[in-house]
Structures are given as structure tokens and as C-alpha cells.
């Protein structure tokens, strides 16, 4: 049975494909989920792919993933810039966590330049559109192999 990676998605990502496609691209979250599941299969993982607009739900899922998954890829969306709760939840997790963003957060508005969760994760991938998810899966593959 393959190991599982959780791919968690924060607020407004359910609107991908119609929300600011010039910034976030034209792929829907369902398109990205299909890409992730296909790539993960090639890497030897299963993917548990989830999205919520609610911070507490994301925190609950981080705790769950810390118990069930070998790694976590998270696109915290706007919560990445504000959530101390998610930062603290990630600190309590022993499996590797990779933060990702579709857009280059450092090339956008000043308030998006700082990530509250970045100090708690293994690494951050941003600016590659939907490919950011694939890069995060590869990073997690590398991190899980190193821990063996």
C-alpha cells in the first residue's frame, strides 16, 4: 500500500479557474487535484487532496495529516500571511511540510511578501502556477527518502 501525502488548500482556491486567472492561471482546483494524483502515483504515493475556506478546519487537517501522512504540501493561500494557528500546528508535526503558492508572493502586494508559516515548514515553492504543486510533491519525495 503506497504512503499518503496530504495536499491541503486554503481559502478561495475552490474558485480557481475563474478567480483572477491572470494571477492564478486557468486551471481549476479539480484540474490540479488530477495532476497531483497522477504525479504522486508515478512517485509511489497516494494523495489525500482537500480544500477549506476555514482556518480551523485546515488546522484540524494538519493535525490529522501529522498522524496519517508521510508528508504534507500546503497552499495556505491568504492564511499563509496571517495564521499563527497554522504555524503552531505545523510546528507540532513531525512529517515534512512544504508550503506552496501558485503566484510569486514576493512579486505581489507588500502584505503578501511575508509568510507566517514559512519558518515552520521545510521549504516554500511559489510562482510556478499549477506546477508549484508538482514541485512540492517532488520535494516531499526527496525529503521522505532522506528520512529513511
From Swiss-Prot:
Catalytic activity: 3-dehydroquinate = 3-dehydroshikimate + H2O
GO BP of this protein: amino acid biosynthetic process; aromatic amino acid family biosynthetic process; chorismate biosynthetic process; quinate catabolic process
Coiled coil: none
Pfam families tied to this protein: DHquinase_II
Keyword Amino-acid biosynthesis listed: yes
EC number per UniProt: 4.2.1.10
Matches recorded under CDD domains: DHQase_II
GO MF entries: 3-dehydroquinate dehydratase activity
Site label Transition state stabilizer, positions: 19
Alphabetically ordered keywords of this record: Amino-acid biosynthesis, Aromatic amino acid biosynthesis, Lyase
Function, as annotated: Catalyzes a trans-dehydration via an enolate intermediate.
HAMAP family on file: AroQ
Family under the similarity heading: Belongs to the type-II 3-dehydroquinase family.
The protein's name: 3-dehydroquinate dehydratase
Amino acid at each position: 500500500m503506497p504512503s499518503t501525502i496530504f495536499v491541503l488548500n486554503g481559502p478561495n482556491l475552490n474558485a480557481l479557474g475563474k478567480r483572477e486567472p491572470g494571477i492564478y492561471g486557468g486551471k481549476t482546483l479539480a484540474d490540479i487535484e488530477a495532476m497531483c494524483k497522477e504525479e504522486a502515483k508515478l512517485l509511489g504515493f497516494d494523495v489525500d487532496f482537500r480544500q477549506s475556506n476555514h482556518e480551523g478546519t485546515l488546522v484540524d487537517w494538519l493535525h490529522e495529516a501529522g498522524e496519517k501522512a508521510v508528508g504534507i504540501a500546503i497552499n495556505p493561500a491568504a492564511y499563509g500571511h496571517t495564521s499563527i494557528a497554522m504555524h503552531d500546528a505545523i510546528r507540532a508535526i513531525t512529517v515534512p511540510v512544504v508550503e506552496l503558492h501558485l503566484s510569486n508572493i514576493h512579486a505581489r502586494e507588500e502584505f503578501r511578501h511575508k509568510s507566517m508559516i514559512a519558518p515552520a515548514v521545510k521549504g516554500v515553492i511559489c510562482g510556478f502556477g499549477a506546477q508549484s504543486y508538482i514541485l512540492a510533491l517532488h520535494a516531499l519525495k526527496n525529503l521522505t527518502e532522506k528520512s529513511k
